[in-house]
């Protein structure tokens, strides 16, 4: 089984990183082959909404996403770890997610209507932390995660969301 962990924070060793490291330790202990991505260290342009992927299922932007797409498609389980920045995900992580419109388009082009919403490819999970105690802190992130995993034909099977965590290592 392949497990992919996506570090959404630009702060290495921060609270969301610590959550993801623990999740990956558990996956490795269960025999999974784990790999990770750090979008903030990669060349990932935002989606241009050019519509090319709507016709072909392939994004025409040439950057690090071309190497990321196969990793996303091969993983059985994906963990997305993210801090909350103004009630949302950091921009580098969000750019990666937005660029998965190509994978959603690919699925819609290549699968029959009855197979388009089977979510039979695997499971996705979100690990999120934020400093504020706001009641709606994670609502937007849950929606983004749900539709990110939908684009990958994966079910969104759960989350760990921790608020009132501000300083590095406070979790």
PLM segments and residue spans:
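Glycine-rich phosphate/pyrophosphate-binding loop and the adjoining helix
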Residues: 1, 29-30, 135-171
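Short, glycine/serine-rich, charged loops/turns that create anion-binding
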Residues: 10-11, 41, 131-132
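Helix-loop-strand module that forms the ligand-binding subsite of alpha/beta enzymes
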Residues: 60-150
């Amino acid at each position: 089984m392949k497990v992919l962990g996506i570090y959404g924070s630009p702060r290495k060793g921060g609270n969301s990183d610590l959550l993801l490291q623990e999740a990956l330790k558990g996956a490795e202990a269960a025999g999974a082959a784990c790999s990770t991505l750090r979008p903030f260290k990669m060349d990932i342009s935002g989606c241009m909404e050019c519509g090319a992927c709507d016709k072909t299922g392939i994004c025409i932007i040439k950057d690090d996403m071309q190497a990321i797409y196969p990793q996303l498609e091969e993983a059985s389980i994906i963990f997305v770890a993210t801090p909350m920045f103004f009630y949302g995900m950091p921009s580098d992580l969000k750019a990666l997610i937005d660029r998965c419109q190509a994978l959603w388009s690919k699925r819609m082009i290549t699968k029959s209507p009855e197979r388009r919403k089977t979510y039979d490819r695997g499971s996705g999970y979100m690990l999120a932390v934020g400093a504020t105690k706001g009641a709606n802190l994670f609502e937007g992130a849950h929606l983004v995660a749900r539709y990110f995993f939908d684009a990958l034909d994966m079910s969104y099977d759960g989350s760990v969301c921790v608020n009132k965590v501000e300083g590095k290592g406070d979790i």
